[in-house]
Curated annotation (Swiss-Prot):
Record text on cofactor binding: Binds 1 thiamine pyrophosphate per subunit.
Annotated function: Catalyzes the thiamine diphosphate-dependent decarboxylation of 2-oxoglutarate and the subsequent addition of the resulting succinic semialdehyde-thiamine pyrophosphate anion to isochorismate to yield 2-succinyl-5-enolpyruvyl-6-hydroxy-3-cyclohexene-1-carboxylate (SEPHCHC).
Highest taxon in the source lineage: Bacteria
Pathway(s) this gene product operates in, as recorded in its UniProt entry: Quinol/quinone metabolism; 1,4-dihydroxy-2-naphthoate biosynthesis; 1,4-dihydroxy-2-naphthoate from chorismate: step 2/7; Quinol/quinone metabolism; menaquinone biosynthesis
UniProt xrefs under Pfam families: TPP_enzyme_C, TPP_enzyme_M_2, TPP_enzyme_N
Originating gene: menD
Family indicated by similarity: Belongs to the TPP enzyme family. MenD subfamily.
Keywords: Magnesium, Manganese, Menaquinone biosynthesis, Metal-binding, Thiamine pyrophosphate, Transferase
GO molecular function annotations of the record: 2-succinyl-5-enolpyruvyl-6-hydroxy-3-cyclohexene-1-carboxylic-acid synthase activity; magnesium ion binding; manganese ion binding; thiamine pyrophosphate binding
Name of the molecule in the record: 2-succinyl-5-enolpyruvyl-6-hydroxy-3-cyclohexene-1-carboxylate synthase
Requisite cofactors: Mg(2+); Mn(2+); thiamine diphosphate
PANTHER family referenced in this protein's UniProt entry, alphabetically: 2-SUCCINYL-5-ENOLPYRUVYL-6-HYDROXY-3-CYCLOHEXENE-1-CARBOXYLATE SYNTHASE (PTHR42916), PROTEIN PHYLLO, CHLOROPLASTIC (PTHR42916:SF1)
Annotated GO biological process: menaquinone biosynthetic process
UniProt lineage: Bacteria, Bacillati, Bacillota, Bacilli, Bacillales
Amino acid sequence: MTNHEQVLTDYLAAFIEELVQAGVKEAIISPGSRSTPLALMMAEHPILKIYVDVDERSAGFFALGLAKASKRPVVLLSTSGTAAANYFPAIAEANLSQIPLIILTADRPHELRNVGAPQAMDQLHLYGSHVKDFTDMALPENSDEMLRYAKWHGSRAVDIAMKTPRGPVHLNFPLREPLVPILEPSPYTATGKKHHHVHIYYTHEVLDDSSIQKMVTDCTGKKGVFVVGPIDKKEIEQPMVDLAKKLGWPILADPLSGLRSYGAKDDVVIDQYDAFLKEAAIWDNLTPEVVIRFGSMPVSKPLKNWLEQLSDIRFYVVDPGAAWKDPIKAVTDMIHCDERFLLDIMQKNMPDDTKISAWLNRWTAYNQTAREIVLTEMENTTTLEEGKIVAELRRLLPDKAGLFIGNSMPIRDVDTYFSQIDKKIKMLANRGANGIDGVVSSALGASVVFQPMFLLIGDLSFYHDMNGLLMAKKYKMNLTIIIVNNDGGGIFSFLPQAKEPKYFESLFGTSTELDFRFAAAFYDGDYHEAKSVDELEEAVDKATYHKGLDIIEVKTNRHENKANHQALWDKIATGLKALD
């Protein structure tokens, strides 16, 4: 044992112990040499749960999914060099979707920086503005002052990651050789000088009385709508419904709002706006005086188009942090306060009998018409087209299941075909940067928290992250993946690019012709190809009770998919005309 080893051990033990005391329970480690002391010290901690992922990009998204589902900070550890750069996509997503990650990167000591040393690159501010905070840690020392410094940075990292708006934090650790700390006796049970832990307390932003009264006055007796985008706060679901009923306002609820699947059905929850707002002819009948938006912007483009054309209205955006989430430049009042506080205080201060029943009835009539058409069409459809897959999942998913939703077509089909249901289904997706990469790993991370967990994903997105399946094999994780295989980029068939057939397939269709049954075998998963509704039901039922990885593949046709969607929209348009 050398003094260097003791210094290294004491310094890192102080830091890691403080992370745990501040609320960290899991660490995702990407193997490497320079990160050896941090990896060993985290593995030695009696409370910290360790996952080892050899693919850094997968590791980043696994941590993202776990932090998203658990709502607590998760640690990521990588060695020096390009390994750390592979975390970038997950960090960008975490920043935009406000997920608390603590990224630890090992680095060469200062004397080996910028001198051509192997596996060394500039890691200072590596993630730029995509992290909330960056610290280049001091070289290890074990004086009282430096041990306080180490533990202080552990507390501070968790505090910054968890403070509203939540997000990723990066700490870079320069480490000298030798890199092996002392594990006997355990650095977490050895006697010696102890340092107190920092207790962190959080508060909620609230509004002053005059602002509350102004908002109540603006909303009393007015035609208004709530727009609720992706927001993962179960505590606001019932208060939102209660306030909407009192005001007589509809709630336009994105699939990721939680309001379509929180265990109850309510007429005020509008789930088919994406379908009926495609018809601009009805917009004049639905012009509000007030809009109050919670969460990020919903996925629906027809909703976005409708909101953009509104004028001379009061448009509130509610955000508990300092973010400015107004991509359509419509906000008239930006409210930075806790959502539950606002709903409760408005409910308390809002006069009774102020609702305009005809206003809510108009919205529910359009919604019910569109919903009945969608449900009827899906009941009468015997083939496994893409909308039918979502409709069947809505029926087949067990109560309290988790559903991770891929980007591109899957999230949009869930918006259209997954209407309100009286089951509790936890829906998750990466809707910060909206990328199709890392979705498998994110779902696996979320599966640590929610069971049973299902993933609805397209073939290209699945291909992007097949490496992530190693975690399912290694840790015997329970995940059912439903691959909608339309052999390429299905969403492009709905976009203007489809009007240029000369290069469409080569540049946008991008057929891969991959056989995914081999991916299932490679990672010890069960494979099922569903060619009919009955086969899909059988596969989902088996997977629900099977512990391990299940891959259910449904092959569809991109061109038929577009035609099927258009036929449904045409029928909804016809049904809406009958209401006028």
